[in-house]
Every structure is written in structure tokens, then in C-alpha cells.
Amino acid sequence: MEKATVNQQKSGPDKTVETKTRLRCTPFLLFDGNCAEAMTFYQKCLGGDLTLTKLGDTPMKAQFPKEKHNRIINAHLKSGAIDISAADWMASPDFEPKRGNMYAIFVIGKTYGELKKVFDKLKYGAEKNRFQDLHDMPFGIYGQFYDRYGVQWIFKGDNKK
């Protein structure tokens, strides 16, 4: 069994708290319609198992126009210690993909509680215009924001609240 580590982190301006976590962080890449092509290329180079899920194959398709239904909503490449997640861009034209905003840190956990503890610490000073609090989605728990340093954090939990 994996041993939890103890870290000291600041939450808010001057508050230090002790945190134990079993969360995993992996790179998360965003593509503009070519996620399947890119991730297939990475699989050919790195080996491993690749899972691709199209938006049109999920209940979420009703929330998007048909022209986005072939976009990848979830891609996952696992090869030994290599673990990369990705998706095609689904955001509005006001926030189009460009170099520099096509990556994120993907925080993966099992329960709402363990995600919420870290989410609430990291969101301090986060940008408000792209903030999504943790909420239930068809695939589990989801939330995202850009922190006060401009880094995008995406949270996903296996279980719903």
C-alpha cells in the first residue's frame, strides 16, 4: 500500500496547515480538435494503453453543438510510470487555445472529501472568470480553476459527492 506523505502548506496569507494526501498529480494536455491524433502519436512513441472517449459517446453531448461531438472529452495514456491525460478544447471562443494555456495539472482522487481539502487551499486567490467549484458530472467529481500564479488546476474524483 502506498504511504501517505505529510506536507506543510500555507492556506491563506499566513496560515500553515498539515496535509496528508494520497492524491495523484499528472500532466493534462488540451488540444484544439486533434487530441486523438496527438495521443495516438504519443502512444506509438511511448507504448502503453490508450483510452479515448468522444463527447458524442457521453450524456454530456446534449450540452454541446453537434460539431463538437467528435472531440475527445477524455484521453488517458498509461505506459509504466508514464501517465498522461488529455482532452480537446470545449471552452467558448472567448478563451481559445493557444500556446501557454494548453496544459494543466490534473489532480486525481477517489473521494470528494480528499479533493475538497486540497481544492480549497489551492483556490485561494484564484481567477474568478474560469472557476468551477467541485461538482458531480457523469464520470464523477469535477472542478477547475486558474490559481493566482496563472496555473490551471483540474480536479477529478472517481466517486460522486
Report the location of each language-model feature.
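Core segments of cupin and vicinal oxygen chelate
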Residues: 19, 29-81, 142
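Vicinal oxygen chelate
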Residues: 2-23, 51-53, 73-78, 84-89, ...
